């Protein structure tokens, strides 16, 4: 009799445990299913925000073509770009003053529309620079912490090995390379696909450049602020610093200034249709005039985004405990200059800068064999014409203020 009672009690306990486990697993599955159901909706918060914004935004006042005739170097840049058949727009600032802003060739070859100072280029990975600035803002506001795991902010973003916010920022997450698809319709769907693919053990905690990292960061920014990425961009950078010649790919008021990207093959130009931009918030769907990028960089240099004790190490240190590598927050700090760069759908957008000069080239023709690549044009302009050959940043040296730079 006692044995039967024991069996009954044991059976009841096991049954209760099973019911609890099933309940827990069911809850977790329902939460994950809820995430999947939500992200599978094609309409996103970013799209909704842009549609509302379109109703109140007007095209900005036109920028004028500028070539400073008082200093011969700008005429030399103009001559060089013509000789190398440059198709795009150049902007150069000297100590924050605009010295050159001029378009060359065509932004829309089929319709014969020329590039001007106002042309906005698809900046590709240069957008990671703006994502990085917003990430740093949230870090300083104590809304996120670099050394904490991503799953603290995106509870459903589970991986076999722990990934921190810093891993994403430095491209050391080990996540598989992002594979864009026309079946993916928004940022949420992109990040879910990244989570499902998981980690490549061979590159875990090794630098491996990957759009996936900044797409996930964009989602983290949305999560901790409770606002769409686009709204964060405008609140924190675009509207705040009057970047009027920049816009996301689907903003209607500035469509007329957005360049079309091309490749040149068999003596003809082919349009490269950017058909996956709806999933690239944070990592490649922003259009920008070179003027606006120069303006943003100068604003950063003037400590108008962060205090000097944050800005100076960010812009000058590498090989230190805080900044062990050249790459951080979407841009590079190197011995001779700082660099922002992006390449996407035939368009290349590159900025070189130091404490005196900021030079930006945006082009909408893919690098072609037999022509001077965009990066080589940048090097010639910065090193040879502007004569910026002196070391700028010193490895392993901590920087507190501008007085310590190169000392």
PLM region spans:
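Catalytic loop of the DD-peptidase/beta-lactamase superfamily, centered on the K-T-G motif
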Residues: 2-94, 98, 276-407
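Short active-site loop at a secondary-structure junction
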Residues: 84-89, 111-167, 201-209, 281-284, ...
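Alpha-helical scaffold elements that line and support the substrate/ligand-binding pocket
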Residues: 90-92, 96, 122-143, 168, ...
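Amphipathic coiled-coil signal-relay and dimerization helices
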Residues: 98-104
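A generic structural motif
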Residues: 105-107, 364-365
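The feature captures the short pre-catalytic strand/loop hairpin that immediately precedes
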Residues: 110, 189-200, 265-278
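Active-site helix/loop module of the DD-peptidase/beta-lactamase fold
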Residues: 122-125, 138-175, 224-261
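Catalytic-site signature segments of enzymes, centered on catalytic residues
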Residues: 179-251, 280-284
């Amino acid at each position: 009799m006692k044995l039967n009672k024991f069996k009954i009690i044991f059976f009841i306990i096991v049954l209760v445990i099973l019911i609890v486990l099933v309940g827990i697993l069911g809850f977790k599955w329902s939460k994950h299913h809820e995430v999947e159901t939500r992200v599978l909706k094609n309409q996103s918060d970013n799209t909704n925000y842009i549609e509302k914004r379109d109703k109140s935004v007007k095209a900005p006042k036109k920028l004028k073509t500028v070539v400073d005739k008082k200093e011969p170097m700008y005429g030399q840049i103009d001559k060089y770009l013509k000789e190398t058949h440059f198709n795009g727009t150049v902007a150069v600032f000297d100590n924050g003053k605009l010295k050159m802003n001029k378009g060359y060739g065509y932004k829309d070859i089929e319709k014969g529309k020329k590039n001007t100072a106002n042309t906005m280029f698809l900046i590709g990975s240069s957008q990671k620079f703006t994502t990085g600035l917003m990430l740093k803002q949230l870090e300083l506001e104590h809304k996120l912490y670099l050394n904490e795991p991503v799953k603290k902010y995106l509870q459903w973003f589970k991986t076999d090995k722990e990934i921190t916010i810093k891993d994403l920022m430095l491209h050391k997450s080990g996540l598989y390379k992002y594979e864009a698809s026309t079946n993916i319709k928004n940022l949420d769907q992109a990040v879910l696909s990244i989570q499902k693919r998981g980690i490549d053990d061979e590159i875990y905690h090794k630098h491996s450049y990957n759009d996936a990292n900044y797409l996930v960061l964009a989602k983290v920014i949305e999560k901790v602020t409770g606002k769409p990425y686009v709204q964060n961009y405008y609140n924190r950078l675009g509207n705040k610093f009057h970047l009027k010649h920049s816009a996301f790919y689907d903003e209607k008021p500035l469509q007329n200034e957005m360049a079309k990207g091309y490749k040149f093959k068999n003596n003809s130009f082919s349009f490269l249709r950017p058909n996956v931009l709806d999933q690239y918030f944070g990592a490649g769907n922003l259009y920008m005039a070179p003027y606006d990028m120069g303006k943003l960089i100068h604003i950063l240099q003037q400590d108008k985004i962060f205090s000097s004790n944050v800005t100076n190490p960010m812009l000058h240190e590498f090989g230190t405990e805080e900044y062990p590598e050249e790459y951080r927050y979407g841009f590079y700090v190197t011995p001779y200059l700082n660099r922002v760069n992006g390449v996407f759908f035939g368009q290349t957008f590159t900025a070189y800068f130091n404490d005196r000069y900021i030079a930006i080239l945006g082009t909408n023709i893919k690098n072609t064999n037999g022509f001077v690549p965009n990066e080589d044009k940048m090097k010639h302009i910065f090193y040879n014409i502007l004569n910026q050959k002196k070391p700028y940043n010193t490895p392993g040296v901590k920087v507190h203020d501008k007085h310590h730079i190169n000392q």
